[in-house]
Structure formats: structure tokens, C-alpha cells
């Protein structure tokens, strides 16, 4: 009886091992078929309240719209929204470490509006943006610089000087460049919130569409 008992146990154990191994083989394709988010190239949108989606519901900011556009076009990027309401270019410098830790392939930089609204000197804005772009360039990160403008009451001289600062910085750092992120929103009803500053969900979709042509040469499939 004892030998039979030993054989029976061996057979059961062997059968259990074979069945378990078979189940692992069946499960393996399910585990490996899922592409980890970390393996997708990261695109960081780094900016102020325009990037953050101030006043909008979840999923309505322009980085959210950009993610949808990229997904539809077959690009497997993971868009990371690093927008902070009220942020100035000084805050952009302070937050660089957080952005660099994400190891992004591309960064869209959108700052400057709050500098103007707070009356910060244009030289300071230019210097801070230069520092941000230098850090990204030194890390071999592709850059898209998104320009902004300010209301007419800031004066034509200041507005033109700000626009020139964006142009010269984009050229210096070999960045893709969109001179005016709000270009597609001008005189289009329903694109700006009641505060007269921030885009609506519709406006965010248009901003994403405005950025995409300049962004595409930086993308890889």
C-alpha cells in the first residue's frame, strides 16, 4: 500500500505542477500584452493656468485634448500636465527638477502671462525662460515654446518686446515655436471663459489643434 500511496502522491503533485505551469503559460500573454505606461515616451505640458485647465472640468484642458489628438493619430505618447495656476517664469525655474524627473521626450513650455499681469520686468521674464530652455536643451529634451500675448492696455511696445523675446529664445534653443497659443481663439465665440483670460473646453481643443502642426516634427511613432 505504501508504494502505491507514494506513487499516487507523486502523480497528483506532478499533475498539479503541470496544470499550474499550463495556467501560467495561458496567463503570460495577458501580462505581457499590456504596454506599461512607463515605456511610453512622455510629453510634458509645462505652464501656468492655461495649461492647468483653470476653471475647467477634468479632461477639458488643452493637454487632455492633445492626448486625445495624439491617440487618434497613432502616437503612443503619455501627456503629463505640469500646469500650475498663477505660475510665473520664476516658478518655472523652481519647478524644473520635477519636470526633469519625469524624463520627458518633449516639453511644451507655456509661461509669461502672469509675469506681465504682475508687472515683472521683461528682462526677468526673458532670463527665466532662457534658464528653463537651457536646462531642457542640456538634458536633450525636445522643446516646443508656446508664445502668449497680453491685453492691449499693456501697450504696444511691451507686447511687441514680449513677442520678440519668445522668437529669439526659440531660435537660440532650436525649439519648435508657436508664436501665439491663442491664435485660433481670436473672435471665435465660446472659446474664452467669462474672466476674459482662460480658454473654455472648446478653446482648449483649438489650442491643442494649434500646437499640433508644430509638435508633429518632434514626435516619433
Regions found by a protein language model. Give the residues of each.
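Bacterial N-terminal signal peptides
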Residues: 19-28
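Serine-esterase "nucleophile elbow" of acetyl-processing enzymes
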Residues: 33-85, 95-103
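N-terminal helical cap/lid subdomain that shapes the substrate entry/recognition surface
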Residues: 86-90
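Bacterial N-terminal signal peptides that target proteins for export
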Residues: 4-20
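Alpha-helical cap/lid subdomain in secreted, periplasmic
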Residues: 8, 12-13, 65, 75, ...
Amino acid at each position: 500500500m505504501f508504494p502505491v500511496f507514494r506513487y499516487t502522491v507523486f502523480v497528483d503533485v506532478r499533475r498539479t505542477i503541470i496544470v499550474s505551469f499550463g495556467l501560467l503559460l495561458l496567463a503570460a500573454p495577458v501580462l505581457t500584452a499590456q504596454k506599461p505606461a512607463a515605456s511610453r515616451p512622455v510629453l510634458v505640458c509645462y505652464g501656468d493656468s492655461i495649461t492647468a485647465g483653470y476653471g475647467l472640468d477634468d479632461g477639458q484642458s488643452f493637454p487632455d485634448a492633445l492626448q486625445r489628438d495624439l491617440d487618434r493619430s497613432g502616437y503612443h505618447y503619455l501627456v503629463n500636465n505640469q500646469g500650475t495656476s498663477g505660475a510665473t517664469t520664476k516658478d518655472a525655474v523652481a519647478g524644473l527638477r520635477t519636470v526633469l524627473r519625469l524624463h520627458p521626450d518633449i516639453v511644451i513650455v507655456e509661461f509669461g502671462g502672469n509675469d506681465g499681469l504682475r508687472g515683472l520686468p521683461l528682462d526677468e521674464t526673458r532670463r527665466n525662460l532662457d534658464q528653463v530652455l537651457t536646462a531642457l536643451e542640456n538634458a536633450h529634451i525636445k522643446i516646443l515654446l508656446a508664445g502668449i500675448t497680453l491685453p492691449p492696455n499693456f501697450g504696444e511696445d511691451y507686447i511687441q518686446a514680449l513677442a520678440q523675446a519668445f522668437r529669439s529664445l526659440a531660435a537660440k534653443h532650436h525649439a519648435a515655436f508657436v508664436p501665439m497659443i491663442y491664435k485660433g481663439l481670436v473672435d471665435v465665440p465660446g472659446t474664452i471663459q467669462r474672466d476674459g483670460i482662460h480658454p473654455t473646453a472648446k478653446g482648449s481643443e483649438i489650442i491643442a489643434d494649434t500646437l499640433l502642426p508644430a509638435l508633429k516634427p518632434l514626435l516619433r511613432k
